């Protein structure tokens, strides 16, 4: 994993944020969606270039998992380690291993979202605010590896910081006191293009 970390650091330092975002899209297209399924047979037949029994077994387990059986060999791994595997194009990991890591990362992200939304609804019901939600989203973003941050809008961090400083009350400052907290959270979590339009307007 240390070699993957070194390769990731070199890649991140040599590319701009925009280039890194494009690289992420390119790599993800090979392990998800049509790009993955178009090469499904080859992906399932892929074997890592190693004689290490543990690594060979891990690759086999990953193929079994992405085909609906067995346990994800990367279950419980940290998000940083998962990212190293997902975006590693050196051949150290098979396509199915990278897909399995991507699935685990997706599951962890989904669990985080469920928790932060539940906490934020409680915050909204009690105070009318979403300041803690914006803070949690910002902290989550800052913890992401550079290649994952690059997939977010350029204005994401700045706008969240602005909303945190504003400490807005969505109940008392909306029509008839019925502001939709869920709508605001959905826009932030789904990276709504109008909300993060990078032109300085505040759309939350």
Describe the predicted segments one by one.
Residues 1-204:
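Type III/flagellar secretion export determinants
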């Amino acid at each position: 994993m240390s070699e993957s970390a070194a390769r990731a650091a070199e890649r991140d330092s040599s590319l701009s944020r925009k280039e890194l975002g494009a690289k992420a899209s390119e790599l993800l297209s090979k392990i998800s969606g049509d790009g993955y399924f178009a090469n499904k047979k080859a992906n399932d037949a892929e074997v890592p270039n190693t004689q290490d029994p543990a690594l060979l077994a891990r690759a086999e387990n990953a193929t079994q998992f992405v085909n609906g059986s067995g346990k994800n060999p990367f279950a419980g791994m940290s998000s940083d380690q998962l990212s190293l595997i997902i975006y590693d194009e050196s051949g150290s990991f098979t396509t199915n291993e990278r897909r399995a890591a991507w699935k685990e990362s997706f599951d962890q992200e989904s669990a985080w979202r469920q928790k932060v939304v539940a906490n934020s609804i409680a915050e909204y019901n009690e105070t009318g605010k979403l300041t803690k939600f914006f803070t949690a989203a910002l902290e989550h973003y800052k913890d992401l590896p550079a290649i994952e941050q690059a997939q977010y809008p350029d204005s994401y961090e700045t706008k969240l910081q602005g909303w945190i400083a504003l400490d807005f009350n969505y109940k008392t400052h909306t029509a008839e006191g019925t502001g939709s907290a869920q709508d605001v959270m959905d826009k932030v979590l789904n990276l709504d293009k109008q909300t993060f339009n990078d032109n300085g307007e505040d759309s939350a």
